[in-house]
């Protein structure tokens, strides 16, 4: 049994397929390109090392990311990524996600932000049919979810579900990449699986013990509906107790109870019920402001020759596709005008620059002509 399940991870076929999944967006790196160009040979070599116990991961590289917020990120060697991807995709992910409730929406096949937004709309419409605009929402956010995640809690989450031989491989990777007793980097696929798994027991508690129908979680952001403030306060107390036992805490400013009719901010949109039961989505104004600043900066880079117009167009198109998920027709029209005006400003600047240069040349020409005429008169 152990050998069969290990073969699903470290067999040549598994590693070779994993290599093809890992190549996306990284073949510009010399190390990744070299591994991929000699894929069969490298996969066989990696298989041999893993089966003989001579495999040793290379030290991860740490770097800083500044957007959307400043944090430390970790990059691992391509060969190590191939092995870990095989382990995650072939065994860890399918086992860990088996017990998930449907409303656990992050980092899973067939789910994601779009599905999460749609589920919230369904909950709101269902609530309106039963209660109209009356009722409240408890919205929760865990303070520093990944930076404060206990290594003991994460490892225990994996240990409870994974076969011993797979858990041993998982534990070794976690301990080699992350020092100390607390804190993970969310860039790793294994850590993302930990992120959606650690709170799985809480999801079941909320649904089955607290009898909450309208409950949804996207990683460490979650919300639920209730008829009264008191009802939701009781649920909040139970959730806080559960989280504190696992060394987490709710963010005091981002966790609150408020009327449903105020609208629910979730994943970059505000979902608001109208008096007729229709749900409208309004994109976060901060997102619009950031996009305008980003576009202006990128147009400036095009002007300096550091970026292509095509790249800027693609970025703006992607943002419009995101905005279109809400009720944003008028906003998109305004942004189209703003974007067009940015290029007009650039063209006007170039025109003014050319006009100024031309005027200077004319002035210099007149000066030279007057000087020549004066010299001729003097000669006479």
Give the ranges of each region predicted by the language model.
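Non-catalytic, polymerase-adjacent accessory regions of viral genome-replication enzymes
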Residues: 1-44, 346-380
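Active-site-proximal segment of RNA-dependent polymerases
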Residues: 2-5, 88-147
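Short, conserved non-catalytic motifs in the polymerase core
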Residues: 25-33, 58-85, 99-111, 173-196
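N-terminal juxtadomain amphipathic helix
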Residues: 36-54, 59-62
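Conserved polymerase palm-domain catalytic core
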Residues: 49, 118-219, 223-242, 258, ...
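Short Gly/Ser/Thr- and Asp/Glu-enriched loop/turn motifs at secondary-structure junctions
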Residues: 60, 216-220, 252-253
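Right-hand nucleic-acid polymerase module
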Residues: 76-77, 85, 176-180, 185, ...
């Amino acid at each position: 049994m152990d050998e069969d399940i290990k073969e699903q991870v470290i067999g040549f076929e598994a590693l070779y397929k994993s290599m093809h999944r890992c190549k996306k967006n990284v073949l510009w790196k010399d190390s990744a390109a070299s591994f991929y160009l000699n894929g069969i040979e490298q996969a066989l070599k990696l298989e041999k090392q893993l089966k003989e116990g001579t495999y040793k991961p290379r030290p991860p590289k740490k770097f800083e990311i500044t957007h959307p917020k400043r944090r430390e990120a970790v990059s691992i060697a391509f060969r190590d990524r191939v092995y870990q991807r095989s382990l995650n995709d072939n065994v860890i992910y399918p086992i860990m996600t088996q017990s998930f409730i449907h409303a656990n929406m992050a980092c899973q096949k067939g789910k994601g932000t779009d599905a999460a937004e749609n589920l919230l709309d369904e909950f709101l419409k269902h609530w309106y049919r039963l209660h109209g605009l009356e009722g409240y929402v408890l919205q929760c956010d865990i303070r520093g979810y990944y930076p404060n995640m206990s290594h003991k809690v994460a490892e225990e989450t994996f240990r409870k579900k994974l076969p011993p031989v797979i858990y041993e491989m998982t534990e070794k990777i976690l301990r080699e990449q992350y020092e100390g007793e607390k804190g993970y980097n969310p860039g790793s696929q294994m850590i993302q699986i930990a992120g959606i798994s650690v709170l799985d027991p809480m999801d079941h508690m909320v649904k089955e013990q607290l009898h909450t129908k309208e409950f949804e979680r996207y990683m460490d952001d979650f919300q639920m509906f209730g008829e009264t403030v008191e009802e939701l306060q009781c649920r909040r107390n139970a959730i806080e107790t559960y989280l504190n036992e696992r060394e987490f805490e709710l963010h005091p400013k981002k966790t609150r109870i408020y009327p449903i009719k105020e609208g629910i901010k979730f994943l970059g949109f505000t979902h608001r019920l109208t008096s007729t039961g229709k749900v409208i989505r309004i994109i976060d104004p901060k997102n619009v402001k950031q996009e305008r600043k980003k576009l202006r900066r990128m147009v400036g880079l095009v002007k300096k020759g550091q970026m292509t117009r095509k790249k800027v167009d693609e970025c703006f198109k992607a943002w419009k596709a995101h905005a279109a998920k809400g009720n944003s027709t008028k906003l998109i029209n305004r942004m189209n005008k703003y974007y067009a005006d940015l290029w007009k400003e650039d063209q006007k600047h170039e025109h003014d620059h050319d006009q100024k240069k031309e005027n200077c040349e004319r002035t210099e020409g007149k000066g030279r002509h007057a000087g020549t005429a004066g010299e001729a008169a003097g000669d006479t």
